[in-house]
Amino acid sequence: MLFETIRARVAAGILLAVFLTAGNVPAQAASTKNIVLVHGAWVDGSGWKPVYEILVRDGYHVSLVQEPLTSLQDDVAATKRILDLQPGPCILVAHSYGGTVITQAGTDPHVVGLVFIAAHAPDAGETEAANGKRFPSATSKTNAIEKTPDGYTYLDPAAFPKAFAADLPPEQAEFEAHAQVLTAAGVFTAAVTDPAWKVKPSWALVADADEIINPDLERFYAARAHSHVVEVKGASHSVYQSRPKEVAALIEEAAQHAQDR
């Protein structure tokens, strides 16, 4: 009888110790497996292919938004259509003007984190055009941005390789210069109303040789949003194509930690 009593007390003590120990171990947040990629002005989603391939290889479910680039409202709507197709929580990633799109669209409940890749991240009432005047880029100081009679913009193909894609192979940069998606001028003067980065954790990549968006503006956005930020030395505005490993690594970091913030 005495032996049985001692054994019962020992067993109870072990169970209590296990319970107390488990209570002191922080819960591990689930990794987010769904990634949505949003392109910027003058391009389409195909430029994300190198990043897409890395993310898919690493086990992520990746979707791409093809914005019409006709208005901020239309581009946000296109993004939300893809968000509605996600099977669970997702990380919303954008390049360039796409940052304005995800700033507006990222309040969607599917989104648990934002990643800005050489991208804009305006506050409520701000526009890309106004912020670009505060932080002029190398390209904005030239006449490289052209406009059609009906109000669609594009980069002078002769200026595109250096301004947009200086670290891509020359043949690729030349092709992209002639494959631009004309973008409504109004997207650059459309104001954000409800910035997602104020309520969602964010990560940001600064391309320090960017000639489309002033790198100091990218730094300003990241600091204001309290983003986890990395800088890629020598990277052009096309950093998402030229440095896909660094870009994918930042996206995966966001995916692994967004839900524990």
Regions found by a protein language model. Name each.
Residues 11-22:
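Bacterial N-terminal signal peptides
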Residues 30-87:
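Active-site catalytic motif of lipid deacylating hydrolases and related acyltransferases
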Residues 40-43, 96-97, 120:
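Active-site glycine-rich loops that stabilize anionic/oxyanionic intermediates
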Residues 93-98, 102:
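Gly/Ala-rich beta-loop-alpha elbow adjacent to hydrolase catalytic centers
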Residues 110-157, 184-187:
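Flexible "cap/lid" loop of the alpha/beta hydrolase fold
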Residues 178-198:
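Active-site nucleophile elbow and catalytic-triad environment of alpha/beta-hydrolase enzymes
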Residues 204-206:
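Short beta-strand/loop motif that positions the catalytic acidic residue
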Residues 208-235, 241, 253:
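Conserved loop-alpha-helix segment in the C-terminal half of the alpha/beta-hydrolase fold
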